[in-house]
Amino acid sequence: MYEWKLNEIVDSGVCARCGTCTIVCPNGILTFDERPKLIDECLRKGHGMCFEVCPRVSSAKYQIKIREKFYEKYYYAKSDIEGQDGGVVTAFLKYLLENGKIDGAIVVGDECWKPVSLVVQNAEDLLKTAKSKYAISTLDALRKAGEMGLEKVAVVGLPCQINGLRKLQYFPYHAKHDLELGRNGKPVKLPKIEYLIGLFCTEKFRYDNMKEVLSKHGIDIEKVEKFDIKKGKLLVYVNGEKKEFDLKEFEICSGCKMCRDFDAEMADVSVGCVGSPDGYSTIIIRTEKGEEIKNAVELKEGVNLEEIEKLRQLKLKRFKKEVERRRENNEYVSFYWTADYGGIGKRADGTYFIRVRAKPGGWYKPEEIKEILDIAEEYNAKIKVTDRAGYELHGISGFDVEDIVLRLREKGLLTGSEGPLVRATLACPGGGNCSSGLVDTTELARIIEDNFKERPAPYKFKIAISGCPNGCVRPQVHDIGIAGVKYPKVNEEKCNGCGRCAEVCKVEAIDIRGETSYTNYNVCVGCGKCIKNCPNEAREVKEEGYLVYVGGKTGREVVEGVKMKLMSVDEIINFIDKVLVVYGKYAEKPQRERLAAVMKRVGYGKFLEEVKELMKKEIC
C-alpha cells in the first residue's frame, strides 16, 4: 500500500466515493472501483490536488457560495423524451448540445446497471443514458473529454460529485495555488465545466451488493428495465412488473451516512422526483446558467416543498447520528462541513477558531460581548481580539463549530472576514469620540459594510478609515484607505497674527507675518487643528471631506497606496466598487496577487483610468 494523504478519508469510511480525486491527478496514478485507490508511488504522497478537491476534506462551500450567489426557484416539469421521471435532465442536455452551449455532456451510462461514466456528444446517444442508476458511479469521462479535445461540457452528478467539481472550478480560491503539475510539467487536461446538473440523492449502493440481494429474490440484474426510489422503497421493474424492496436490505456506501446534502445545493440546477406529481421532475434553479433549463422544458409552479424539506431533514438527521456515533467510538471525522461557514479555520493543534466579523467601527453592544464570553466559558475557548477589532474564539472542537456559528448568528454576530474577500472595515473612533476626529468613521464604516461585506475578491481586500490625517489605523497601507481632512483658509479681516494656529500645527505648515497667518499647502496635512483652536475664528474651512488611498499593503512587502482626490461618501462607494471590478478583471493568480501587485503589473495610470471610466458610466 502506497502512502497517500487521502488514505485516512478512504479507509475510515468518510469517503463520498465521488471520484473527483481520480480525475485531477496529473500523473494518472489513481484508479476508481467503487473507491479510489493509489496504484503507484506518489512523489508528494497525496499532498496535492487530489486532497484539495476532496469534498470530504473541506466543502469550500462558503467561498464558492459567495461567488456563485446561489438562490432557489422551485418548479416541476416533464419533457416529451422518455427518461427518469419526465426526462427533464435529458431534455436540458439535448438543448445544450443542439444549441452549441456545450461540446459534450458527462453522464452515467451502464453495463448491466453497473454505472459507467460516458462522454455524450449527440442527442441520439444521450437517449440511451436517460434512466437513473443507484450504484456508485465515477467521473472518468470528464478526463476523457479533455483528452478528446472538448472545451465545454455539462456534467450530471450526485451532490458529492457536484461539490467536488465546484471545488475544481474555484480551485485557486480555496487551495491558494494553481493546478498541480505532473511529472511531465503539465496539469491534467480537463474541459471547462459550463453547467453542473445535480440529482437528488439520499444514498447510493454498492453494485455487487445490489446484484446479490436481487439475486436472492430471483431477479437477474441484467434483466431489470428500470430502478426507482420512492418513499423508502427501491422499485425494480422487470418484465413490465414492479417489485418493491425495503432500502434497508441494501448496503449503502458508508460515506453516504456522512453526507448532509440531499438536493445538490451547489449545482446550477437540481433535479429529482420528490415534491412533484408522478411522471414529473422537480427542478430547483440556483444560478443564471440554471435558468437556461426554461428553454428546454415548460416549467410549472406548485412544488410540494414540505416533501423536499422532509428528505433534507431525514438526511441531516442520519448525518448527525453518524457523527455522534463516530464521536462516541473515537472514530475519524474530517469536519468537512465547517467550511460551509465563513470565518472558520483549523489551528495547528487540530482544533478550530471561529472569527466574528468586526462590527462597523469596532463598536459592540454589551450583550454581544457577553454572548462571546458565555460561549468561550461554555466551550472552554480562548478569546483573541484581532487587529481589525474582531473577536476570535480559539480551541473549539470540530463537533461544536456549527452550533456556535448558528448561536452567534442569532445574536447578530456574523462569522467571516477570512479568505479572498473584502475583510471587515477597520476604523478609528472618529468624530464625536476622538478629539482629533473630523468625520464620523462609524457611519462610513457601516455604509461600506452594507455595500461590500464579505464581497468576493481575488485575494484579501482590506479597507481602513481614519477620522483625521493622524492615520492611527494606517489608511495609507490598505487596499483602500480613507482619512477625514479639513484644509484651512484665513479670514484676513479676523486674523490678528496672535500665532495660536502656528503653535498647534504639528507639521509646521503655518507662518505668522505681521498680523496675518499663512499656510504652506505643500506641508499642510488637513488636520483642522488650526481651525478648531483659533481664538478669533479667523481660520475657516477651505476644503473638507475624505482623502482616499488605493493599492496599499503591509506584510512581506510594505506598499503605500496612491493618493487620490477628496471624495464624497457616494464617490467612495462607487470608487471601491469599480476598483474591485478592475482588480477582478486583471488578477491572474487568485490568492497570490494583492491589489498593489496587480496595479503595479498593469500600470497605475492604466488601472486607475479604467476605474475612473467605469465610475463615469455609473454616474451617467
Swiss-Prot record:
Domain 4Fe-4S ferredoxin-type: 6-35, 486-515, 520-544
The protein's enzyme class: oxidoreductase
Catalytic activity: 3 oxidized coenzyme F420-(gamma-L-Glu)(n) + hydrogen sulfide + 3 H2O + 2 H(+) = 3 reduced coenzyme F420-(gamma-L-Glu)(n) + sulfite
Binding site for [4Fe-4S] cluster 4: 524, 527, 530, 534
The enzyme's E.C. designation: 1.8.98.3
GO molecular function: 4 iron, 4 sulfur cluster binding; heme binding; metal ion binding; oxidoreductase activity, acting on CH or CH2 groups, with an iron-sulfur protein as acceptor
Temperature-dependence annotation: Optimum temperature is above 95 degrees Celsius.
Triggers of expression: Induced by sulfite.
Coiled coil: none
pH dependence: Optimum pH is 7.0.
Required cofactor names: [4Fe-4S] cluster; siroheme
Binding site for [4Fe-4S] cluster 3: 495, 498, 501, 505
Annotated residues for binding of siroheme: 472
Matching InterPro entries: 4Fe4S_Fe-S-bd (IPR017896), 4Fe4S_Fe_S_CS (IPR017900), Co_F420_Hydgase/DH_bsu_N (IPR007516), FRHB/FDHB/HCAR-like (IPR045220), FrhB_FdhB_C (IPR007525), NiRdtase/SiRdtase_haem-b_fer (IPR005117), Nit/Sulf_reduc_fer-like_dom_sf (IPR036136), NO2/SO3_Rdtase_4Fe4S_dom (IPR006067)
Cofactor note: Binds 4 [4Fe-4S] cluster.
Similarity comment: family membership: Belongs to the nitrite and sulfite reductase 4Fe-4S domain family.
Other facts noted in the record for this chain: Expression in Methanococcus maripaludis, a sulfite-sensitive methanogen, leads to sulfite detoxification and use of sulfite as a sole sulfur source by M.maripaludis.
The name this protein goes by in its record: Coenzyme F420-dependent sulfite reductase
Organism: Methanocaldococcus jannaschii (strain ATCC 43067 / DSM 2661 / JAL-1 / JCM 10045 / NBRC 100440)
Organism lineage string: Archaea, Methanobacteriati, Methanobacteriota, Methanomada group, Methanococci
